[in-house]
Amino acid sequence: MENAHTKTVEEVLGYFGVNESTGLSLEQVKKLKERWGSNELPAEEGKTLLELVIEQFEDLLVRILLLAACISFVLAWFEEGEETITAFVEPFVILLILVANAIVGVWQERNAENAIEALKEYEPEMGKVYRQDRKSVQRIKAKDIVPGDIVEIAVGDKVPADIRLTSIKSTTLRVDQSILTGESVSVIKHTDPVPDPRAVNQDKKNMLFSGTNIAAGKAMGVVVATGVNTEIGKIRDEMVATEQERTPLQQKLDEFGEQLSKVISLICIAVWIINIGHFNDPVHGGSWIRGAIYYFKIAVALAVAAIPEGLPAVITTCLALGTRRMAKKNAIVRSLPSVETLGCTSVICSDKTGTLTTNQMSVCRMFILDKVEGDTCSLNEFTITGSTYAPIGEVHKDDKPVKCHQYDGLVELATICALCNDSALDYNEAKGVYKKFGEATETALTCLVEKMNVFDTELKGLSKIERANACNSVIKQLMKKEFTLEFSRDRKSMSVYCTPNKPSRTSMSKMFVKGAPEGVIDRCTHIRVGSTKVPMTPGVKQKVMSVIREWGSGSDTLRCLALATHDNPLRREEMNLEDSANFIKYETNLTFVGCVGMLDPPRIEVASSVKLCRQAGIRVIMITGDNKGTAVAICRRIGIFGQDEDVTSKAFTGREFDELSPSAQRDACLNARCFARVEPSHKSKIVEFLQSFDEITAMTGDGVNDAPALKKSEIGIAMGSGTAVAKTASEMVLADDNFSTIVAAVEEGRAIYNNMKQFIRYLISSNVGEVVCIFLTAALGFPEALIPVQLLWVNLVTDGLPATALGFNPPDLDIMNKPPRNPKEPLISGWLFFRYLAIGCYVGAATVGAAAWWFIAADGGPRVSFYQLSHFLQCKDDNPDFEGVDCAIFESPYPMTMALSVLVTIEMCNALNSLSENQSLLRMPPWENIWLVGSICLSMSLHFLILYVEPLPLIFQITPLNLTQWLMVLKISLPVILMDETLKFVARNYLEPAILE
């Protein structure tokens, strides 16, 4: 039923053709069940294990590697001679890499539990309904409830469907609907129509929503929506429709993969075509097909060389290390790629309650009457320090601490706060914090009593558990609470009837009242001044109300409560406590004692974090279900708005936002910094508009209602105290619910990206070198300098360790003084591309040169001519060009060993070059990153391992080197440092002075 909240009870019952006392007939139930289906959320069809595995192979680079492995396997199958076993090593290693990669990918996907499934935990198992087949209420499975059913709910129940209340069977009905609205204070419900068809869920006071909890009271209602038609069902549909965006890093790596695959394909084809003339060379036995296959193998080796196989593992390791560092700062990252996305966050949309504020109501101001003369009066105003539930704070008057027992009015005010109250403070030993037990508003009053200590109770030596309610206990020993007149909407107040624990002639029964100021003060005939009471005159009333209005609408927008007493109440037996309509009669002729103003105060550290965001070019937007006045006041206190800043077109309510045209809504999202009284759908819409401006949005949330927006935004941030649905829909969970933790995580994300750029460039320059090496050997007609199994070893192990260590580079000092980077900015641009191409060409040329040196110039080498080396495939005994040359020398492992050793050593030098993008090694020495030094030592040790420990040399087709050969390796390798230092010097001084580190 649409807009059931706007209809009267009779209209709703008439729509379903149902009687409140008897319920639906079985025939009606059957028809309605057929029409609307079961009252449950459909289960989400998850991906099968096979689908998840296949997904891991959709990446282009992975497919190229898979193809290379398959081709290598086929070629190895037909291999003859000694190389039969070693030929299988390459496809086996490639497949091993791909399998490991797929396992990690599948595990991560399985680990990200389905947020849609988590919604089901809010579905109650049973419900209580009235139906015509039974005279009394019956318990049935909640999934069998249909629209039109008459449902009974009571305290502790979970609401089984969306229900329009028809009658309330208790004084009040309080509902905790925080999972849907995000607001922690329970809501008082009624049965009157709410005429506004566009009312937000918070304002539909005559509706109960599926999955919410009854905090107090008992009521009956008619079901108006079930299953996916409920509010929680709409959230589920929105989540199903929300596609997960790929992170900027994933998009970059996808683009890089596509470009690389095109380059690889071109080079492979080019190498094959260049050598068509050699297909018939004698070494291939004159067989054109065998020659074609030989060069096809070289093309496959090229593909293996060009792909940085170690990159996925290094990126995963770097992100995992980043998540550990973030966890220490209370940011628990659930999705690894999002660590890097945090670095380019340009907008943070934050909840107010609990994130920007403490979510711990505290009284910060109060007043009592000082003097009254006719229509004029003066007040004693006090401020209270301390912004949490900890019973630690002072009462100040004119900025100086005061002793509360010196003021009779404060003693009485504390007595009302302690007795007209059902809450308590509770010390949580495990977490070492004070928590509320009961309503937030009442806990604030309990905490105030502890800070006031009106009877000067000795508090030293008490444990924290004893300290929690020490001062309240003293007051409760003096008077005993007999009964409570519950809060009701008509009088907007509640009261308690108390009798003295030690009766005497002077002490008598009293009623203590607290409630909304306008309601309570209208029923006050007198006013307390010190220990006397004087009549309340219109002038005094006006003065008191003007102060209360000022507190409620000023810079703090405090929530005010008036406190009063009834000095001569009726006796209990004279009251009718069954009918709450009579309560207002018993709460008249009151004496006004004072007023307290409370708020959910901003966290102390938030203002500095908001300032840091401004420096870093990040816009902070507050999004809250609270009213606009309170939201703007908090924004001013924490620096989102200036103290006197005009908030027109910068702060909107959900209603105001809906009334704008789509283009005006888009403009609003470009400038706004505060959205109040919003619904979940607004959050998703705001994220969409921000994304249309290419903003990278971090969105916080804790309720079920926030899940679609958390899923839609680039970075969904759930609260540690939030619902399971919010957590599973998010990329990150704040263990401490603190806004400042988000800012610390953004800083970490920026540092991680900078380090990632360094190691990605490092790995790519290595791959460029390998490609140049293989291309040169093929183009010059030299014997193979590097084979695929060696390239895999270098790409995975030797390069992988220093690349991982580059993830430990210290962050720049000015990292949060720069604007967010453009997510579309390429990983490697212009000058840097030239730099890494130049270095790569040197790496390739040096590797080929090292192999050629052994053939042409080495003392222990064959000393063949350049012509003989470049035409080695024509070598045979009857060829005069190769007279005196043993053709087997061209298959010696020495040139390969020289090439591999030069490649490894140059890469270690290159790792040192990557310590900083533009800073010289003289300014930033290697020991700035001790992990890098350690990883270089480990990589070289592993290289010695495969050189000198059997049977590894056989697998890698290499052989140990002597000292002369090692000295030549160093002579060829070390110039790469000088070369990069020169390029850095040019960059620093001529090309990119703005990037000076």
UniProtKB/Swiss-Prot annotation:
One Pfam annotation reads: Hydrolase
* Major enzyme class: translocase
Q: Write out the PTM section of this UniProt entry.
A: Nitrated under oxidative stress. Nitration on the two tyrosine residues inhibits catalytic activity. Serotonylated on Gln residues by TGM2 in response to hypoxia, leading to its inactivation.
Lumenal side: which ranges? 70-89, 274-295, 777-786, 851-896, 949-963
Cite the binding residues for ATP: 353, 442, 489, 514, 559, 624-626, 677, 683, 705
Q: How is its activity regulated?
A: Has different conformational states with differential Ca2+ affinity. The E1 conformational state (active form) shows high Ca(2+) affinity, while the E2 state exhibits low Ca(2+) affinity. Binding of ATP allosterically increases its affinity for subsequent binding of Ca2+. Reversibly inhibited by phospholamban (PLN) at low calcium concentrations. PLN inhibits ATP2A2 Ca(2+) affinity by disrupting its allosteric activation by ATP. Inhibited by sarcolipin (SLN) and myoregulin (MRLN). The inhibition is blocked by VMP1.
Q: Where does Ca(2+) 1 bind?
A: 304-305, 307, 309, 795, 799
Give UniProt keywords alphabetically. Answer: ATP-binding, Calcium, Calcium transport, Disulfide bond, Endoplasmic reticulum, Ion transport, Magnesium, Membrane, Metal-binding, Nitration, Nucleotide-binding, Phosphoprotein, Sarcoplasmic reticulum, Translocase, Transmembrane, Transmembrane helix, Transport
Q: Which residues bind Mg(2+)?
A: 351, 353, 702
Q: Which residues carry this modification: Phosphothreonine?
A: 441
The membrane-topology field of this record reads: Multi-pass membrane protein
Essential cofactor(s): Mg(2+)
Manganese is among the record's keywords: no
Subunit note? Interacts with sarcolipin (SLN); the interaction inhibits ATP2A2 Ca(2+) affinity. Interacts with phospholamban (PLN); the interaction inhibits ATP2A2 Ca(2+) affinity. Interacts with myoregulin (MRLN). Interacts with ARLN and ERLN; the interactions inhibit ATP2A2 Ca(2+) affinity. Interacts with STRIT1/DWORF; the interaction results in activation of ATP2A2. Interacts with the monomeric forms of SLN, PLN, ARLN, ERLN and STRI1/DWORF. Interacts with HAX1. Interacts with S100A8 and S100A9. Interacts with SLC35G1 and STIM1. Interacts with TMEM203. Interacts with TMEM64 and PDIA3.
Give the domain section of the comments.
Ca(2+) and ATP binding cause major rearrangements of the cytoplasmic and transmembrane domains. According to the E1-E2 model, Ca(2+) binding to the cytosolic domain of the pump in the high-affinity E1 conformation is followed by the ATP-dependent phosphorylation of the active site Asp, giving rise to E1P. A conformational change of the phosphoenzyme gives rise to the low-affinity E2P state that exposes the Ca(2+) ions to the lumenal side and promotes Ca(2+) release. Dephosphorylation of the active site Asp mediates the subsequent return to the E1 conformation. PLN and SLN both have a single transmembrane helix; both occupy a similar binding site that is situated between the ATP2A2 transmembrane helices.
Spell out the family assignment given in the record's similarity comment: Belongs to the cation transport ATPase (P-type) (TC 3.A.3) family. Type IIA subfamily.
Name of the protein described by the UniProt record: Sarcoplasmic/endoplasmic reticulum calcium ATPase 2
Q: Which organism is it from?
A: Felis catus
